[in-house]
Amino acid sequence: MVEPLLAGIVLGLVPVTLAGLFVAAWQQYKRGEEVG
């Protein structure tokens, strides 16, 4: 019964983690663009 829960957690966390990394990279890019 633990495996479906674990799979749900992983499937929930992976898109959130990717979205967080994408947003951080985009903010850094925009900040660099403003400075340049």
From Swiss-Prot:
| Short name of one Pfam family | PetG
* Keywords for this protein: Electron transport, Membrane, Photosynthesis, Thylakoid, Transmembrane, Transmembrane helix, Transport
Question: What processes in GO biological process is this protein linked to?
Answer: cytochrome complex assembly; photosynthesis
Q: Name one GO cellular component term.
A: plasma membrane-derived thylakoid membrane
Q: Where found in the cell?
A: Cellular thylakoid membrane
How is this protein situated with respect to the membrane? Single-pass membrane protein
**Record's function text:** Component of the cytochrome b6-f complex, which mediates electron transfer between photosystem II (PSII) and photosystem I (PSI), cyclic electron flow around PSI, and state transitions. PetG is required for either the stability or assembly of the cytochrome b6-f complex.
Family label: Belongs to the PetG family.
Q: How does it assemble?
A: The 4 large subunits of the cytochrome b6-f complex are cytochrome b6, subunit IV (17 kDa polypeptide, PetD), cytochrome f and the Rieske protein, while the 4 small subunits are PetG, PetL, PetM and PetN. The complex functions as a dimer.
Name of the protein described by the UniProt record: Cytochrome b6-f complex subunit 5
